[in-house]
Amino acid sequence: MGTAAVGDYWNHNTAYHPWLVGIAAEHRGDVLDVGCGDGLLAERLAPVSRSVTGIEPDPATADRAVERVTDLDDVQISRTSFEEFDPGTRRFDLVTFVASLHHMDLRTSLARARDMLAPSGEIAVVGLWANGSAWDWVWSACCLPAVMVGDRLHRDTPDIGVTIAEPRESLRAIRRTTAEVLPGAVIRRKLYYRYLLRWSS
């Protein structure tokens, strides 16, 4: 697996970084980025946040994140899994997951994120789903031309040298579980085989 150098790049996940930065800017508070990877999102969140904490369980990837944010005083990287992360008494104004939620148990992780929110805090997810219905496959096929254009236009960097996993849950299953844990959450099917989830406490 290759290792991308520290710097900006574009792929199907970073395509939605502006959406997340926009939400963070509404709060100007404390952000928890779960599965922060090489720290690019944490770096981008820093200018609009009081503090950013990134969680990354893979040691080598966490080291890259630390290198990226080393000059940012209000960004910390924790080398741990979300399951083992202990926030103490801290509560967050925004908890983000970018292509990380499908690495974990969906129900448990959403509930844990919910319980770490400050009053009026939010959860924002850029997630992946597994095609589980005919409509899922039709949607994916119809999006392919736009995806190919986007990849070429933005010079897609699909492999940045981080651990990946195939999604297990269908979007229908994700919607069902999310509705039980985060009533009123909004989930939208988007380009690049991603969905966006947003919920306010």
What is each stretch, according to the model?
Residues 11-29:
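Conserved alpha-helix/loop element of class I SAM-dependent methyltransferases that forms part
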Residues 29-37:
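Conserved class I S-adenosyl-L-methionine
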Residues 38-40, 44-84:
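Class I SAM-dependent methyltransferase SAM/SAH-binding core
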Residues 96:
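A conserved beta-strand element that flanks and buttresses the S-adenosyl-L-methionine
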Residues 104-113:
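A short, conserved alpha-helix within the catalytic core of class I
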Residues 120-127:
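Conserved beta-strand signature within the Rossmann-like core of class I S-adenosyl-L-methionine
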Residues 129-177:
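C-terminal alpha-helical "lid/dimerization" subdomain adjacent to the S-adenosyl-L-methionine
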Residues 164-201:
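Conserved Class I S-adenosyl-L-methionine
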